Amino acid sequence: MLPHMTCRHLLATAQWIADNPAWAGHPALMQVTSADIARMSSQQTPQPVIGVFEIPDHQAPVVDGRALVLALDSVQNPGNLGTIIRLADWFGISDIIASRGTADAFGPKVVQATMGALVRVRVTYVDDLAGWLDGAGVPVVGTFLDGRDLYAADDLPLSPAPIVVMGNEGSGISPEVEAVVSHRLLIPSFPPGRQTSESLNVAMATGIVVSELTRRMHSNG
């Protein structure tokens, strides 16, 4: 039913089942009442169907350099993680590699923030993010306050496609991961020299970097 997940239970009201006859007889389907749905859901106005899925045990992928990969270094806010997963889905990124310090991709707040994107994006947790990046065999891009202007760095490697690392909300990319970043970038504020916010939200920054790199890859391809 979904690319990366196995459905164990599909709990639905009689009306939902009547409106979706293709699901009739499915072994995972179980009819429940609207009151049952309300008790199980954390939403104020829940949908008439709830799916229970097995949490997948992804293995870290072999990076082939054909598409961008995201790496998250202790991104701890569930809303940020969910938004980043949704961004990845929008830009065709299939894999996110996360350190153990990153929020749980299958926590309720993250799942809600992904708006369904979690079923198409694999989130894999690794014990040693720096070691994994070092052995990936492709360029590693990260954002830093002393990095090169994202829009002026015309010599960024795009083939093979790089891994984009985003760091913790408060402390940024850790020293261990910074040591394996091959290209340091800065998202500039405009106009230059104007007093502005101290920093960008990590999910916003991810969207800016991924959008620019994707634009270049498609322009050059």
Residue ranges and their predicted role:
Residues S42-D64:
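Acidic/glycine-rich phosphate/pyrophosphate-binding loops and surrounding catalytic core
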Residues Q15-I17, S34-I37, G101-A103, E169, ...:
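Short, acidic/turn-prone active-site loops that include or flank metal/cofactor-
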Residues G51, L87-F91, T102-G107, Q112-V119, ...:
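Structured adenosyl-cofactor binding patch, chiefly the S-adenosyl-L-methionine
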Residues L2-H4, H9, M30, P56-L150:
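RNA substrate-binding interface of SAM-dependent RNA methyltransferases
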Residues N20-A22, M40-S41, W132, Y151, ...:
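Short, charged, surface-exposed secondary-structure boundary motifs
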